[in-house]
Amino acid sequence: MVRIGVVTFPGTLDDQDAARAVRLAGAEPVSLWYASTDLAGVDAVILPGGFSYGDYLRAGALAAASPVMSSIRRAADGGLPVLGICNGFQVLCESHLLPGTLMRNEKRRFHCSVQQLQVASVDTVWTCDFRPSERIHIAAKHGEGNYVADAATVAALEANNRVVFRYTANPNGSVHDIAGITNEAGNVVGLMPHPEHSVEELTGAGTDGLGFFRSLMTFLSAQL
């Protein structure tokens, strides 16, 4: 069975939600502790949402320096699929696995709603089951989701098809309506909205989030 690691930092909130989404996709979630460098031989890693280390210094900055991230950086450079959700996206940027940074929302308010996203790239491990330009609905909740990068970085992301999702109604001021991006290899994806909160009709946010986890399963099955 496919085994997907779900990291828990001090202040992580959504690790259990991510684990449930993994189970619904047919894989086994494996808990990974922030203070350990052992990735337990998992096939992929999820950095879930929350407020790691209370967002002190900068959101994701202290988590980026934790022992588990040293192992994840090496593994990601070797091709391990990694998904960073909300605070996990912030950690990926602070770890320099993804470029840019996430700043306070443009209106300086915490934002919580179901967001419509447009799929901008299906050429990643985590989006290969979506259709190009497909519009999906994913829950979002963040106070520091305003994606910012210098002009050269944004131009490179656009030119190399590394913008993965865009907001259709930008809730936070992110440059170019960017909701998520990927690395050059397409194995590391970060986004602010929460696909793990959009996997069951019961929650009211639909099931479009399952596409992330099913995409991973499709990718891994093709590697066998």
Swiss-Prot record:
<keyword id="KW-0436">Ligase</keyword>
<feature type="active site">
    <location>
        <position position="196"/>
    </location>
</feature>
<keyword id="KW-0067">ATP-binding</keyword>
<keyword id="KW-0315">Glutamine amidotransferase</keyword>
<comment type="subunit">
    <text>Part of the FGAM synthase complex composed of 1 PurL, 1 PurQ and 2 PurS subunits.</text>
</comment>
<dbReference type="GO" id="GO:0005737">
    <property type="term" value="C:cytoplasm"/>
</dbReference>
<feature type="active site">
    <location>
        <position position="194"/>
    </location>
</feature>
<keyword id="KW-0547">Nucleotide-binding</keyword>
<dbReference type="InterPro" id="IPR010075">
    <property type="entry name" value="PRibForGlyAmidine_synth_PurQ"/>
</dbReference>
<dbReference type="Pfam" id="PF13507">
    <property type="entry name" value="GATase_5"/>
</dbReference>
<keyword id="KW-0658">Purine biosynthesis</keyword>
<feature type="active site" description="Nucleophile">
    <location>
        <position position="86"/>
    </location>
</feature>
<comment type="function">
    <text>Part of the phosphoribosylformylglycinamidine synthase complex involved in the purines biosynthetic pathway. Catalyzes the ATP-dependent conversion of formylglycinamide ribonucleotide (FGAR) and glutamine to yield formylglycinamidine ribonucleotide (FGAM) and glutamate. The FGAM synthase complex is composed of three subunits. PurQ produces an ammonia molecule by converting glutamine to glutamate. PurL transfers the ammonia molecule to FGAR to form FGAM in an ATP-dependent manner.</text>
</comment>
<protein>
    <recommendedName>
        <fullName>Phosphoribosylformylglycinamidine synthase subunit PurQ</fullName>
        <ecNumber>6.3.5.3</ecNumber>
        <ecNumber>3.5.1.2</ecNumber>
    </recommendedName>
</protein>
<keyword id="KW-0378">Hydrolase</keyword>
<dbReference type="GO" id="GO:0004642">
    <property type="term" value="F:phosphoribosylformylglycinamidine synthase activity"/>
</dbReference>
<feature type="domain" description="Glutamine amidotransferase type-1">
    <location>
        <begin position="3"/>
        <end position="224"/>
    </location>
</feature>
<comment type="pathway">
    <text>Purine metabolism; IMP biosynthesis via de novo pathway; 5-amino-1-(5-phospho-D-ribosyl)imidazole from N(2)-formyl-N(1)-(5-phospho-D-ribosyl)glycinamide: step 1/2.</text>
</comment>
<keyword id="KW-0963">Cytoplasm</keyword>
<dbReference type="InterPro" id="IPR029062">
    <property type="entry name" value="Class_I_gatase-like"/>
</dbReference>
<dbReference type="GO" id="GO:0004359">
    <property type="term" value="F:glutaminase activity"/>
</dbReference>
<dbReference type="GO" id="GO:0005524">
    <property type="term" value="F:ATP binding"/>
</dbReference>
<dbReference type="GO" id="GO:0006189">
    <property type="term" value="P:'de novo' IMP biosynthetic process"/>
</dbReference>
